[in-house]
Amino acid sequence: MTAIDFTAEVEKRKEDLLADLFSLLEINSERDDSKVDAEHPFGPGPVKALEKFLEIADRDGYSTKNVDNYAGHFEFGDGEEVLGIFAHMDVVPAGSGWDTDPYTPTIKDGRLYARGASDDKGPTTACYYGLKIIKELGLPTSKKVRFIVGTDEESGWADMDYYFEHVGLAKPDFGFSPDAEFPIINGEKGNITEYLHFAGENAGVARLHSFTGGLRENMVPESATAVVSGDLADLQSKLDTFVAEHKLRGEIQEEAGQYKVTIIGKSAHGAMPASGVNGATYLALFLSQFDFAGPAKDYLDIAGKILLNDHEGENLKIAHVDEKMGALSMNAGVFRFDETSADNTIALNIRYPKGTSPEQIKSILENLPVASVSLSEHGHTPHYVPMEDPLVQTLLNVYEKQTGLKGHEQVIGGGTFGRLLERGVAYGAMFPDSIDTMHQANEFIALDDLFRAAAIYAEAIYELIK
């Protein structure tokens, strides 16, 4: 058979690929718990994006299935073995700091800007077109492909729990998720959130009325705001000095004898907390110089003096390193304090390697004398597919052939749908020289990378199912 130029095949379909991708990116598919009902398990946005994706697949001649608006799939080909491709249509909150409307896709200087451009609507569409090329060329295959799209990957994966329970099909035999980076992700750390709990008593000469920071546990808080009152001498001048020293932005608004203090850092993916600047921990550090008392003081001291830049849990004594999987990472992701509440929290999203466990981490955190600790019900254990597995070898071979770069295994702190299968990995779509803007303002994907990824996906899928 004549060798197929997958890059040329993508070139023929570039405009169609972008048109379909734009139609997905224009949908605000953030989870919205305030609008959850029986028809919209995570709010209307994720459902709308799922329906649009399945509409595209219907148009292209696939038989689709929507599993109660939690997730959906279509299948291609025949065979006893099934290759699963797992993607998602939900996105993290857009947040602030964008130069463009996050839901008006914008191409500028060879980059496509929008929330979801790189995580995960762009890679999903590239992978979809990779399979579409195989279908349209009529290439011979011996295995079935099930392309599965979820709507709750960025939160608790309740979409996949429901999907597998109700779809009436066995899990695919092997597969990948186009939701990370090349050359491959064949290992993922465990993922759990642990919560520190504080009371709200607040009797110092300085008073903390509220403290709020962070949108999601798996995002570094870009900004945080506290409402304070009392003895706060030279508050403005001290803030000016503080933000200049730490290269931050900040502001104070006065209203009815209270001060609303905001500090702005930089958001990032919670699996890579060191690449962000946690506005909440810096705000706590700034406020801790004033004379707060009781649980309010404890809250600020923990956040500002222990959690600040403690990306591997050293200060909390939970640090752990595995030779193959690397170091534990920790993101202090969501901060909620209200003086009228008896339960004020800091959410710690922890990505842990083999050799430790959520229960062990919790027992160490319980040594903190000023806070109680609870463990989220939903988590993921560490996952690893050996380099010798034919799935890993095939994907790396295609990557090497198309890029000329040496493939190698990688373990990440991020969690992808690849871990849903025992023989599951993540594969693209970010390249080693790409700029990672996932979960950040001004998220983008370079168009050249998008099209390169589509060609790699086309050849990789074909090699796996031919």
PLM feature spans:
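Active-site metal-coordination/substrate-binding segment of hydrolases
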Residues: 82-149, 155-156, 173, 441, ...
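Predominant activation on well-ordered alpha-helical scaffold segments within soluble catalytic domains
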Residues: 54, 125-132, 161-164, 197, ...
